[in-house]
Amino acid sequence: MKKFKIYCGGEFIETSKELDVVNPYSNSVFAKTYYASSENLETAISKAQQVQLDMQKLPSFKRYEALKYISDELKARIDYFAEILALESGKPMKYAKGEIMRSHQTFLVAAEECKRLPGEVMSLDWTPAGEGKHGVVRYFPVGLVAGIAPFNFPMNLAVHKLAPAIAAGCPIILKPSTNTPLSTLALAELIDETDLPKGAVSILPMDRKTGNQLVIDDRFKLLSFTGSPHVGWMMKADAGRKKVVLELGGNAGMIITKTADIDKAVATAVIGGFAYSGQVCIHAQRIYVAKEIFDEFSARFVKEVNKLKLGDPMDDDTQISSMIDEANAKRVEAWVDEAVSDGAKIICGGKREGTYYHPTVLIDTKPKMKVCSLEVFGPVVTLEPFASFEDAISEVNNSEFGLQAGVFTNDIHEMDYAFERLDVGGVIINDSPIFRVDHMPYGGVKDSGLGREGIKYAIMDMMEAKILVR
């Protein structure tokens, strides 16, 4: 059985406490790594502080070279990384390869952003006090960054913390999910092969108590967290004076109007609703369909959902595999059962087998049901008809979350209305809310988070403006 060392202060080390990594599909341990102790974390912090000035002074072209190298090697070694990711997360292999390619692209975007780090020369004589003076504005790294990544995209969502930190010149300590730590520890091998200062990056699986130091320790100047709203907002309350960026998920809505291309809407909704068993914070959880086409859309949607192939994530033909663990599968089962007892109807799925929960479609739901009001984070979609576009917008907004929404329409006025009125961080036209490319601003409002990811936007969060006046 392979053991992965953790990456602490620029060195690969073992510790006294092993961490078993379970394959969700087989429910068996397939590899081991180690928990970092509080002493290991202190070593990583100390080393990061020692190299902080070196990172700040590292020329942009050197940062570019490091990021470009990592990007190129991820693409070259895609099979190696995808296998690790699929085994630890239960993600079907074709989606695991897709995530590695996204990570390759995210590092590449970060490399390119190194060439355009902001700065400006400005005249100050707009008021009498500034006569004869000008300013030079530069952006400096904020300092040590703490990154906490989730299990569902264990590589790419970690890269969204690592890559901008390197581009900005910030040392970073990353805590991967203890369910899925191996892909980022494998990534550490590539980071270690670059010319970045040793200690600029540490990747440390930690238990909750040790990991909480990333939140409360004032030596960290920015905390970037991706995870549940409950945990994220507690972290913000405990984070003190450091900057905080939160990406916290949601229960994304999708609107299908009567002018929509139904063929495309059905195909897109199936992917948006059930990719990675719905364990995506922007999965199309609530779908609202114009009443004129509701019956046709529902029938065609269910027909396509029933075609999805369930199976071993290592099989290239598998489209749906297990959830991350049986506890989450049981939670989803309980939420669906509760909805049914309150009047909802299952028109597809509704069955659990161990860590599997079969793709499930519900109708006749009510807004206060958990499957509507909370983040299911599982393979469950609700379908409801709407009478007017304004009603559909109101239903999507009737949520504590506001990450992204999808709108299928060929009416430009409806597109503009949706963009103006939907209370979300992103409006996706003629696609599902699951759409994301890694350089766009990504984040939400309300309980869905604070701040934005997307390399350029993350880099700006990780830098501070300083002005020289003369």
Residue locations for each model-derived region?
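Conserved C-terminal structural/oligomerization subdomain of aldehyde/semialdehyde dehydrogenase
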Residues: 28-32, 255, 309, 341, ...
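A short hydrophobic/small-residue beta-strand
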Residues: 171-173, 346, 426
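Rossmann-like NAD(P) dinucleotide-binding subdomain of oxidoreductase/dehydrogenase enzymes
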Residues: 123-264, 386
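Short, well-ordered beta-strand elements within core beta-sheets of diverse protein domains
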Residues: 30-36, 51-57, 147, 254-257, ...
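Glycine-rich loop-to-alpha-helix module at the N-terminal edge of alpha/beta enzyme cores
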Residues: 30-118
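ALDH superfamily catalytic-core signature
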Residues: 230-366, 429
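Hydrophobic face of amphipathic alpha-helices that form TPR/SEL1-like repeat modules
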Residues: 1-24
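Residue-level signal for inorganic ion chemistry
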Residues: 27, 63, 85, 107, ...
